[in-house]
Amino acid sequence: MDLPSHSINAMKSMEVIDINTGTKLGLIKDLKIDTEEYKVISIILPGSKVGGWFSKGNDIEIDWTDIQKIGVDVILVNGDNLFVNKD
């Protein structure tokens, strides 16, 4: 059985949507990868920039297990466990 696969570049152009609220969360900015297990741990989305043009936004981290479905042009996630990274 062939599993569907997507390139990182293709995934970065897919809209990420919370299935609970229907909210568009944005596009993938980065991936967090476990280099020992060769697995994706989470996806990182750019957060909203509060405070003006030059302010740093808080990134949103979504655990890979919270991804419900990867389609042709959209990624559906369970947004109950969103983590906002305030680095």
UniProtKB/Swiss-Prot annotation:
Protein name listed in UniProt: Uncharacterized protein CA_C1697
NCBIfam families, per the entry: spore_YlmC_YmxH
Family note: Belongs to the YlmC/YmxH family.
Membrane-spanning intervals of the chain: none
Cited InterPro entries: PRC-brl_dom, PRC_barrel-like_sf, Spore_YlmC/YmxH
Lineage: Bacteria, Bacillati, Bacillota, Clostridia, Eubacteriales
